[in-house]
Amino acid sequence: VLIACATLDVHRVLLIGGGATQVTGPYTKVMDLLKTGLLADYGITHIDIAGHPEGNPDDPDPEQSLIAKLNWADTHGMHSRILTQWSFDAPAVNSWIERLRALGFKQPVHVGIPGPATLKALLRYATVCGVKTSSQVLKRQGLSLGRLLLINKPDRLISDLRGYDQLHLFPFGGLARTTEWLKQR
């Protein structure tokens, strides 16, 4: 993959890890790859690192893991930004960003949010992705059959978010539906 990145003049990569029940390569964590120096050897100068405002079932301390990666990037002259797991819980995301900023981290934060989707689809993805708080928020909206089939749009969530640099959309309701919603904004 790194040879292809160098050949194609790719300088930015998104680094995510975990979730696999069986490791298939030499690296069990993103930090293992970072420590090799291979990214810089192949021309990678910018890294996007996953952030988990609601925690991560595969990491007992995801905030410390993120901080370690950000510090590593700074120490090694690598540009970094944070792309978060999707969330439906604006207060949790806002508090998480505030904690990072209070610790002195200034990297751009791209907050992951779901595009328009049914409550049923959002609950399914919340379970798969381990997004606990968002799952609880969605369940509080009511689980009647009619409610499960309504399309939920992220407009209110967006208006409640603070301190982020950009949004990163997860098109759980389909790419066409998300694209149409974006055109109407």
Annotate each PLM feature.
Residues L14-L15, L83, H168:
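Conserved beta-strand positions in the central sheet of alpha/beta enzyme cores
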Residues V1-T21:
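A generic, well-ordered mixed alpha/beta core segment in the N-terminal half of proteins
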Residues D9-H11, Y42-I47, H79-S80, F105-V109, ...:
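Short, well-ordered coil/turn segments that N-cap beta-strands
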Residues A6, L70, D74-T75, R101, ...:
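Non-catalytic positions within long, well-ordered alpha-helices that form the structural scaffold/packing
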Residues C5, K69, M78, V111, ...:
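Conserved, mostly hydrophobic/aromatic
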Residues G17-G18, P26-D58, P62-A68, A102-L157, ...:
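Active-site pocket-lining/capping segments in soluble small-molecule metabolic enzymes
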Residues V93-N94, L175-R185:
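C-terminal helical cap(s) of enzyme catalytic domains, especially alpha/beta-barrels
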